[in-house]
Amino acid sequence: EEHLMQAVEDLRKETNGCVLGMKADVCKAEDCTTLIDQTVEEFGGIDILINNAGKSAASGREALSDEAWQEDLDLKLMGAIRMCRGAVPHMRKMGGGSIVNATTSAGKAPGSLALPTSVSRAAGNNLTKSLANELAKDKIRVNAVCIGLIKSTQWERRSEKGSLEELYTELGNKVPLGRVGEAEEYADLVAFLCSARGAYITG
């Protein structure tokens, strides 16, 4: 919650705009409903939805319990479904909108020990294409960004025993471009997909 409030403060300073910050668990339907309702109350509607909830979860099948599978699917797949269910009616009222689902490259090309994330994200990619086909008539575009290696606090936590830059260098050696991506590069792509310049991109 501290990071959320800091992000709200930073955005207000940078944009001088109205920013609403709320703590919500997308695994809980009631939290999703409250988030949608308060957003509509504050801004008068919804025309952009970015489903970005997730956490690092990757291991082999034998180490995964039913509960671990369900938890990952509930967060990454059902969370997106709940938020889309709540936001789409408001987008229709506004004459259209844009939804971006954050998935991962493992959802298209999984490596070993990538479960359950690779399955949850593959389902997210399928959800994206299904909704894109269904909602196109309402001028609602739906896209997915299959994220690769991006600098984040998750990697910072993993580097406690060593240098963060050394970890990024090691990870970057596995990437064709030779480096780990910046969060701003991911954000720029999402902003493009949500903008008028991405108006002919869906699915």
Language model regions located:
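Short, flexible catalytic-loop segment of classical short-chain dehydrogenase/reductase
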Residues: 108, 146-157
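Substrate-binding pocket helix/loop in short-chain dehydrogenase/reductase
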Residues: 60-73, 167, 171
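The beta1-alpha1 cofactor-binding region of Rossmann-like NAD(H)/NADP(H)-dependent oxidoreductases
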Residues: 1-2, 23-34, 66, 184-185
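Active-site loop-to-helix junction immediately N-terminal to the catalytic Tyr of the SDR YXXXK motif
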Residues: 64, 110-119, 130, 158
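Active-site helix of classical SDR
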Residues: 84, 120, 128
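C-terminal substrate-recognition "lid" of short-chain dehydrogenase/reductases
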Residues: 179-203
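Alpha-helical segment proximal to the catalytic Tyr-Lys
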Residues: 89, 133-137, 199
